[in-house]
Swiss-Prot record:
It comes from the Bacteria. 4-CDP-2-C-methyl-D-erythritol 2-phosphate binds at residues 11-13, 37-38, 59-61, 145. Belongs to the IspF family. Involved in the biosynthesis of isopentenyl diphosphate (IPP) and dimethylallyl diphosphate (DMAPP), two major building blocks of isoprenoid compounds. Catalyzes the conversion of 4-diphosphocytidyl-2-C-methyl-D-erythritol 2-phosphate (CDP-ME2P) to 2-C-methyl-D-erythritol 2,4-cyclodiphosphate (ME-CPP) with a corresponding release of cytidine 5-monophosphate (CMP). Homotrimer. HAMAP family: IspF (MF_00107). This is 2-C-methyl-D-erythritol 2,4-cyclodiphosphate synthase. SUPFAM superfamilies: IpsF-like. The record marks 37, 136 as: Transition state stabilizer. InterPro entries: MECDP_synthase, MECDP_synthase_CS, MECDP_synthase_sf. GO terms for molecular function: 2-C-methyl-D-erythritol 2,4-cyclodiphosphate synthase activity; metal ion binding. GO terms for biological process: isopentenyl diphosphate biosynthetic process, methylerythritol 4-phosphate pathway; terpenoid biosynthetic process. The lineage of its organism: Bacteria, Pseudomonadati, Pseudomonadota, Betaproteobacteria, Neisseriales. It comes from Neisseria meningitidis serogroup A / serotype 4A (strain DSM 15465 / Z2491).
């Protein structure tokens, strides 16, 4: 058994009217939000998937199914913390998190410091160990047409 593991996570949600836009646990002013069973925080869902995957614990859907009433409109920070408790129970600790959020709009840069702080707090790691990159899709495809927002995440775990 190795003492380090890498996990990769991915999530995408459709942009729609009548929903709040929440990324990294931050409510971002925008005319549309992400559609989903929970708060549809694509960034935190990708981080959660990366953590669970690195620990060999499946994915976010197996722990928090979108068919379960108790997760309707759930705060994804709560889900992230619960998933991380499962990861820690298996003897793993997060070392760092590196993420990319692809969104044509809105501009994410003003919100990245708070997103980083939220993830660092939820995982109990230093903010310097959390990175978030905001990218556009250069107006290409469904992301470029502002039909959705996509997130990718990588995490490094060490045995504790």
């Amino acid at each position: 058994m190795t003492n380090i593991r890498i996990g990769q996570g991915y999530d995408v949600h459709q942009l729609t009217e009548g929903r709040k836009l929440i990324l990294g646990g931050v409510e971002i002013p925008f005319e549309k939000g992400l559609l989903g069973h929970s708060d549809a925080d694509a960034l935190l869902h990708a981080v959660t998937d990366a953590l669970l995957g690195a620990a060999g614990l499946g994915d976010i859907g197996s722990h928090f199914p979108d068919t379960a009433a108790e997760f309707k409109d759930a705060d994804s920070r709560v889900l992230l913390r619960a998933a991380y408790q499962s990861v820690q129970a298996q003897g793993w600790q997060a070392v760092n998190v590196d993420t990319t959020v692809i969104a044509q709009k809105p501009k994410l840069a003003p919100h990245i410091p708070q997103m980083r702080a939220n993830i660092a707090a939820d995982l109990g790691i230093d903010i310097s160990c959390v990175n978030i990159k905001g990218k556009t899709n250069e107006k290409l495809g469904y992301l470029g047409r502002m039909e959705g927002i996509e997130s990718q995440a990588a995490v490094l775990l060490v045995r504790i």
